[in-house]
Amino acid sequence: MPELPEVETVARTLAPQVCGRRIVGITVLNAGTWQGGTAADEVKSLTPRIRGISRRGKLLLLHFGEGGPDASGYEEEISVPTSAEQWPLFYSASGMEQGRLELEGEKPETVTGLAFHLRMTGRLFVWPQGTAPGTHTRVIFDLDDGRRLFFDDTRKFGQVRALCGRELDKWNFWRELGPEPLEMIPEAFASRFSSRKAVKALLLDQSVLAGVGNIYADESLFRAGIRPGSRGCDIAPERLRSLHKALTDVLLLSIRECGSSIRDYRTARGDVGAFQNSFFVYGRAGELCRTCGTRLESARVAGRATVFCPKCQQD
């Protein structure tokens, strides 16, 4: 499943292609993909202009609105800050901007954007005018310049949802999302781990932190030297602050590498990520630790396959 770095990368590679364009047509090819109480035809009737793109947890958000530059001819890929202090971010036709775009309009029924949950195999690609949908295309968005934005999803677990005040109030997943790890100070981060649950289970819990999945939980715990099954409440505050730094570092490193491509993930330009080449533990059970040479072990933590080094991760 695409995690925070992968969704962030899709956002920054999609923005130069679609920001400033209007959506003039929507075709839903798989009814189960379009979720919520606002129909696709209702969104299409607005011919909304894509003002910007942002991310919340593992969700990619298209924001509607007037004003700002047009995306015509803008092909530069947006660079990403290397410091967590520069977040939150959103991407527009003029490039990368700081701040947060609002999703709730003055009226609860005002549609202010779209949310894409990529889940296991969701992808977003822009194609030339007249391109026919593929076998796994679930929703087509026709843009005012003739190009087409396809939401492809092999497994059909992904979702698209129109956003407005009335929808956000009813969407439990949205209301329960925890804070963004790249926007937290170490003390606030550490305070989220007072539970008796395993620290990895807490990292994966989207109500504790938004956007972290199996890859970056394993990688950050290794870098912090913490055993995945350790109870959150048993870990000293200074160790949790180390985990905060490790998680921040690994997320930013992965974003700079355009995420991790293991099976299905691609950027919005069709490129593969490269961070999988830097894994210390994820997917490497039985191999030798790159730090100490000990054979890596595997276990089930929070119902997920987990890889760790028994020597480097002692807590």
Label each residue range with its predicted role.
Residues 2, 6, 181, 239:
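Catalytic cores of large soluble enzymes that bind and process phosphate-bearing ligands
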Residues 91, 99-223, 231:
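Phosphate/anion-contacting hairpin/loop surfaces
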